[in-house]
A protein has these predicted regions:
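A conserved acidic beta->alpha catalytic loop
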Residues: 158-167, 191
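Short, acidic, metal-binding catalytic loop of nucleotide-sugar glycosyltransferases
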Residues: 141-151
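Cell-envelope/extracellular polymer assembly enzymes that use nucleotide-activated donors
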Residues: 121-124, 153, 311
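Long helical/loop segments within the catalytic core of UDP-sugar-dependent glycosyltransferases
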Residues: 104, 178-180, 188, 196-204, ...
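N-terminal membrane-anchoring/stem segments of glycan-assembly enzymes
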Residues: 2-119, 428, 457, 464-467
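Membrane-embedded multi-pass helical conduit in multi-pass membrane proteins
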Residues: 66-93, 102, 106-108, 117, ...
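Short aromatic/hydrophobic "clamp" motif used to bind/position activated sugar donors
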Residues: 211
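Acidic helix N-cap motif at the loop->helix transition within catalytic regions
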Residues: 137, 163-172, 223
Length: 479
């Protein structure tokens, strides 16, 4: 693969976002065959795919253990056997297993077809907004252009903004050319109470049984709502929510945004695909997901916590429901532009994961394929901890000739990492091509994402775990 062609999506290259991403988009509905990626080749039952992925991951891990005997002896001689075994397990063995499982899953993945319904159900869109005067008009513009035949109710939920969010949103609603099947209004709650409270109030005001949530700075592709609904109606009947694919909108703003573009385009997208294939999508993210009202009410709505979307998602899973994933239902969001904003966001995500474990730990013991991914998330805490406290100092030591931690064998995970990045790039590029989107060049962002992004992200994740475990005051840190 030519590395010069590796790139991430961009929707702000000298044009208005709306004109740019709609290029090549059909005005009419696609047939099920054209609108869904079904894949070709030999059909394999899902349990067999799961078994094959597990077998490959176990075999790769066994090979890694065999190759690491000398490394283990050297590190144990310099420290002790227990430390050496724990360090190498979380530096090499476990990441190797994860990469091998992810790689084999991506190779085996075939998106199930969507069924186009005869009629589309009415849908309420909840737009959570706090100090979004700069972005809310674009968000509403994207909603006004939705190619959706059913009725749409748009509720802008102003959570006590201190800027002109209400005025800008109200003016946009009055000026935009909404279709006859679309209604829109602003609910101004006056006081900032948190995103969960605003969404729960919006749910009580909503008139329809399908509830879509987006953030006040998100931009939804023209067929985004339609494809989310089609996926929800096409998936098994126990599916009560579907997560859309969220990508980066402001990738040209600075170097940090360019790196995050790859995180969304590759990292997050590959994990969502993996979980979705095994009926185990763990998070219907608040930035762009659709829910059935019944499931929201049975789960008690959005909980008052910093990670309300993941805790709600796990509550839905605990009710024995399923969450799906629509890889071609696209929305674009503005990511943090400063190190401080990025750190606060990822700390919030890490706290949300710990909140979900504390609230819904029985999910760890369900007899489902998706239980593997719950345990996968359990491993994040020691993985991030060892990476931050052991591997990063080991990299510094390697610069002075001490290779006990970061030695030649640590590169054993690189072949799998390169392979799955190449595969997910090809998959994602195919999605964008079918959607009429441009994949722009972003080599420098990719190199930073591949070589140094973890050095920034993992310590922040550890920070989030610690403050949640120690019970520090909860605060919604905005972007």
């Amino acid at each position: 693969m030519d590395i010069q062609r590796l790139s991430g999506p961009d929707v702000t290259a000298g044009e208005t976002p709306l004109d740019h991403v709609e290029r090549g988009e059909a005005d009419c509905f696609k047939s099920p065959a054209a609108g869904a990626s079904t894949g070709k080749g030999l059909y394999l039952p899902l349990p067999l795919k799961f078994a094959l992925a597990c077998s490959f991951a176990i075999a790769w891990t066994a090979l890694s253990v065999w190759l690491s005997f000398r490394w283990l002896d050297d590190l144990a001689g310099a420290t002790n056997f227990a430390f050496a075994l724990i360090a190498i397990t979380f530096i090499a063995y476990l990441p190797g297993f994860m990469n091998a499982f992810l790689l084999s899953t991506l190779v085996l993945d075939r998106r199930p077809p969507r069924v186009v319904p005869v009629s589309y159900p009415p849908t309420t869109i909840l737009v959570a907004a706090y100090n979004e005067q700069a972005a809310i008009r674009d968000t509403l513009t994207s909603l006004a252009r939705q190619d959706y035949p059913g009725s749409i109710e748009i509720l802008v939920l102003n959570d006590g903004s201190t800027d002109n969010t209400v005025e800008v949103a109200t003016r946009a609603i009055n000026e935009l050319d909404f279709a006859a099947n679309v209604s829109a209004r602003v609910l101004d709650f006056g006081v900032n109470r948190g995103k969960a409270a605003a969404l729960n109030d919006g749910l009580r005001e909503a008139q329809h049984d399908l509830i879509l949530t987006i953030d006040g700075d998100s931009w939804v592709k023209r067929d985004g709502l339609r494809k989310l609904v089609e996926r929800l109606l096409s998936d098994p009947p126990e599916t009560q929510a579907v997560a859309g694919a969220v990508m980066v909108r402001n990738s040209r703003e600075n170097f940090l945004c360019r790196a995050q573009e790859w995180d969304y385009f590759h990292g997050i997208a590959s994990v969502k695909r993996m979980q979705g294939m095994y009926h185990g999508t763990l998070v219907a993210q608040g930035a762009f997901s659709i829910y059935r009202r019944k499931a929201l009410e049975q789960a008690g709505g959005w909980p008052e916590c910093v990670g309300e979307d993941i805790v709600l998602s796990w509550a839905i899973l605990r009710l024995n429901y399923r969450i799906g994933y629509a890889d071609d239902a696209l929305a674009f969001t503005n990511v943090p532009t400063t190190i401080r904003q990025f750190a606060l966001q990822r700390k919030r995500w890490s706290r949300g994961l710990m909140e979900a474990f504390k609230a819904h730990w029985p999910l760890l013991f369900r007899r489902r394929m998706s239980t593997l991914f719950i345990w996968w998330n359990v491993c994040f805490l020691p993985l991030d901890l060892i990476y931050t406290l052991v591997f990063m100092p080991g990299l510094v030591a390697a610069c002075f000739g001490y290779f006990y931690i970061a030695g030649p064998l640590t590169i054993a995970v690189l072949p799998l990492t390169i392979l799955w990045n190449g595969i997910i790039y090809r998959i994602q590029s195919g999605v964008y091509r079918r959607e009429g989107l441009i994949v722009r060049q972003n080599l420098r962002g990719f190199l930073f994402y591949a070589l140094a992004y973890s050095l920034l992200m993992q310590p922040v994740c550890v920070w989030g775990y610690v403050v949640e475990l120690l019970g520090f005051r909860k605060k919604w840190d905005t972007k």
